[in-house]
């Protein structure tokens, strides 16, 4: 990703790419942690049993290793979850705290066809790779047991596939019990899961049919790796960060990964953070039965009563100034307008900036009110184009609730509109408002506001 700030109109497009996450060591990174309403970073650390005294981060393995917390961080698209998770990884990955293993499923799995078994195999592969890279040896006994177990699965799978060419784990219980040996096994399974539908289904079925054994091996491997990490002075406990769940193909697939697989999720004993798609926040009570859920909201820039949250505006001004020199804006007030219509979402703000740069007058060489309004009009009507009357009626109710200072109840329509960023959510989810860009659309103006 480009790390150069835009000083000319032509450079803006590359500086505002909104589908590329920014990490804490990147020049564009902005810390929003103190302006996210009721969300507090320290809550995450407490859930993970991390002590944060004297500005450091530590984990007491003797006291907390047996607890193995499963934690879901739920939030809307474009709220900055990936950047936030990367910050946690940076803070916690240290000898006196966690050995953090980040698994971005979008980069490694087939997002059109992914199941929980696929994620688990990916977790094993990533952990083994990171251990190998850190020169951390693991007990040979667990490696031998895994080799033997997967050799049996290979025999079953090849028989079910009638000897189909191309599926070969390379398992040999006589080979040295090295990390690279099982790393190859996990890699080959992952490749097999992304092959034909028949092959993927056969592999998954073989693993699912013996899931208690699989989970037992997984958990033993985690514990042996934890012991090795402590002895090597590389970490006190493994922490998985699983990102990208919201980018899988369908809501049905995402629900299956979390809700339908809850029994298998319970059987895996490792400290883990999952991102939780916004539409599954309605299942919070179910998920809380086997894990902990926290809402990661947009930045609240306007109170329910309509007054600006000045601190949030200042942070977003910093966010913009790191990417675009402020001299490229017609006025400081125009910068505030961009922020206001971003609705507290870093990604939505970048989307508006990109559109405005597209409509900007090259002869002027700046972003002015004219290109800003053209961008808003285009984005507003595109975003609202397929709103049904049922959704418009619900938006009107939410608008009236906010005027009266009331919280709006959740339902499936609200869930759909949160997923599509028609609605935006703040604080702990109790405050919802219409995306300010949508409010400008002809449909909203006519059907909701009656203008």
Segments (PLM) and residue ranges:
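Conserved beta-strand -> loop -> alpha-helix junction used to position metal-binding or nucleic-acid-contacting
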Residues: 101-107, 297-298, 367-374
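Walker A/P-loop-proximal flanking segment of P-loop NTPase domains
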Residues: 1-79, 83-94
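The catalytic "switch" region of P-loop NTPases
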Residues: 7-14, 42-47, 202, 206-209, ...
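Conserved catalytic-core segments centered on acid/base and nucleophilic motifs
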Residues: 73-80, 245-248, 261-268, 272-273, ...
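C-terminal leucine-rich, beta-strand-based interaction scaffolds used for sensing/assembly
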Residues: 2-7, 367-451
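P-loop NTPase nucleotide-binding core
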Residues: 69-70, 75-233
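Amphipathic alpha-helical "lid/sensor" segments that cap RecA-like P-loop NTPase cores
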Residues: 331-382
């Amino acid at each position: 990703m480009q790390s150069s700030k835009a000083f000319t109109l032509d450079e803006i497009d590359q500086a505002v790419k909104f589908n590329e996450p920014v990490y804490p060591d990147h020049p564009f990174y902005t810390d929003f942690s103190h302006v996210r309403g009721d969300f507090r970073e320290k809550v995450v650390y407490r859930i993970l049993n991390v002590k944060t005294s004297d500005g450091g981060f530590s984990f007491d393995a003797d006291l907390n290793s047996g607890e193995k917390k499963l934690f879901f961080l739920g939030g809307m698209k474009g709220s900055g979850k990936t950047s936030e998770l990367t910050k946690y990884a940076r803070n916690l990955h240290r000898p006196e705290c966690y050995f953090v293993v980040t698994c971005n499923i979008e980069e490694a799995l087939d997002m059109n066809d992914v199941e929980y078994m696929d994620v688990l195999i990916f977790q094993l592969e990533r952990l083994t790779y990171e251990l190998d890279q850190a020169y951390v040896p693991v007990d040979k006994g667990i490696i031998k047991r895994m080799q033997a177990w997967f050799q049996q699965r290979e025999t079953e799978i090849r028989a079910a596939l009638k000897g189909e060419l191309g599926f070969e784990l390379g398992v040999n219980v006589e080979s040295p019990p090295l990390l690279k040996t099982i790393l190859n096994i996990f890699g080959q399974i992952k490749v097999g899961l992304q092959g034909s539908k028949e092959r993927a289904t056969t592999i998954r079925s073989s693993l699912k049919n013996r899931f208690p054994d699989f989970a037992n091996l997984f958990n033993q491997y985690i514990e042996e790796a934890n012991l090795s990490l402590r002895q090597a002075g590389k970490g006190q406990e493994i922490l998985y960060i699983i990102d990208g769940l919201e980018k899988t193909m369908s809501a049905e697939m995402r629900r299956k990964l979390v809700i339908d697989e809850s029994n298998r999720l319970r059987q895996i004993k490792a400290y883990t953070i999952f991102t939780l798609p916004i539409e599954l926040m309605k299942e919070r009570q179910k998920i809380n039965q086997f894990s902990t859920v926290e809402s990661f909201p947009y930045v609240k820039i306007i109170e329910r009563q309509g007054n600006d949250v000045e601190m949030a505006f200042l942070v977003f001004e910093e966010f913009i100034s790191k990417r675009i020199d402020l001299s490229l804006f017609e006025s400081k007030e125009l910068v505030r307008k961009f922020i206001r219509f971003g609705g507290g979402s870093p990604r939505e703000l970048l989307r508006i900036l990109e559109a405005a740069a597209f409509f900007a007058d090259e002869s002027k060489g700046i972003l002015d009110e004219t290109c800003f309004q053209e961008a808003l009009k285009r984005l507003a009507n595109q975003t609202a184009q397929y709103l049904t009357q049922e959704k418009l009626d619900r938006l009107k109710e939410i608008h009236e609730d906010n005027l009266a200072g009331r919280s709006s109840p959740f339902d499936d329509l609200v869930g759909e509109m949160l997923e599509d960023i028609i609605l935006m959510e703040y604080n702990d989810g109790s405050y919802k408002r219409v995306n300010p860009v949508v409010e400008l659309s002809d449909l909203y103006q006519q059907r909701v506001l009656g203008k």
